[in-house]
Amino acid sequence: MTSSAHGLPRGFRRLGRRGSFLLLALLVVPGIALMVGRSVPALDPILESPVFHLYVVSAIAACALLVALATASYAVRDGRAAPVLIALGCVAVGFMMLGHGLTTPGIFGRPPNLWVARLPVLSLATFAGCLAAAARPEGAVSRLVAGSPRVALGFPMASIALASAAVAIDPTVLSGTTPVPGEGQVRTALLVASAVTLLIVGALHWRRWLLGRDRIELALVLASWLTMSALLSLAYGQFWRLSWWDYHVYLLAGFAAAAWAVVAGYRGSRTLTGAVGGITVRDPLEHVAHGQPDALHALIGAVEAKDPYTHGHSARVAELSTRIGLLLTLEPDAVRGLHQGAFLHDVGKISVPDRILNKPGDLDPEEWEQIQRHPEGD
């Protein structure tokens, strides 16, 4: 299967409405599965295995930390807030979920404790908050982070790692055996707020994915909505039952998809920009242009090499046409088609002889007729 450096493999890029339905199913199917499982005890069996649980959360942590490493490395060079915030959200999931596994009763003699239940909620709430802040580059948090990205990256990362290590070593510390007053209400509020936030952020990235079919945008949709499904399972699933294991599966799927997007992007471009640079794109026009195949850009480059006089004309026409389409709120597929058609409107020039295109003087009637016929070659 061939692919484009700008996004998904071609077969995947053509999912169209079917892909949209599959993504929307992520919002519905987990909830239905949870309700059925909780209503029919036979479908929600007890599956107690602390060691296997540690393996699963370690896999989640590895995927999240891989994404964090890539986005943090890019953030140091780029200096914008979005990659810093996404890196911090993934660091929180990575270290806290690993701490969740290490505080599980029965692992290395760990006693019953509250941190095994607290860490997943804190990690996913942090992830949701970071994604929401990253989606608003003009917001106060983004402006603060952009002012000193290295400090904004380093200090929270170290704090999260140290705090996770502390409770993993001794899960009885910091009220690890006794609930603090109001803890249940705070937990519920965090779960609800995080789920709503991830629903909205996922919808934003879904819109961007529809415009450009960009791999990293699809990864953010999956990570957002699968994490939202995980929160639902975390809230209503019963400890050690299948309904509780579901949230681990959703998290692993979401962060594995994000890790795949990063690795595939890097393999295709051999640069961090190619791997995660799409997370800094905010202009819808950029998403549309970013989603066009490399062959199209190469073709227009060949046309403009033949006619330097109109260099950049195709890109300008495509930009204006696309902005009009966006203002008219056309469907994403129509906007992408409009951009592509406008970008290619002068491709017929490639069949016009160079002696005519680059003639220093006036064109004779026959030459002028050939120039006027160039759209026929489009």
Segments (PLM) and residue ranges:
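Individual alpha-helical transmembrane segments in multi-pass integral membrane proteins
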Residues: 17-28, 46-140, 242-255
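Interfacial "cap-and-anchor" motif at the non-cytosolic start of specific transmembrane alpha-helices
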Residues: 59-60, 166-283
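Metal-dependent catalytic cores of enzymes that make or break cyclic nucleotides
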Residues: 298-378
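Short, charged amphipathic alpha-helical "coupling" segments at sensory-output junctions
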Residues: 283-294
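Aromatic-anchored segments of alpha-helical transmembrane domains
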Residues: 30-35, 92-99, 160-168, 224-234
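Alpha-helical transmembrane segments of multi-pass membrane proteins
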Residues: 22-42
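Short, Lys/Arg-rich, polar N-terminal cytosolic tail immediately upstream
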Residues: 1-15
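Membrane-interfacial loop-to-transmembrane alpha-helix junctions, especially the N-terminal start
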Residues: 17-25, 78-90, 146-156, 211-223
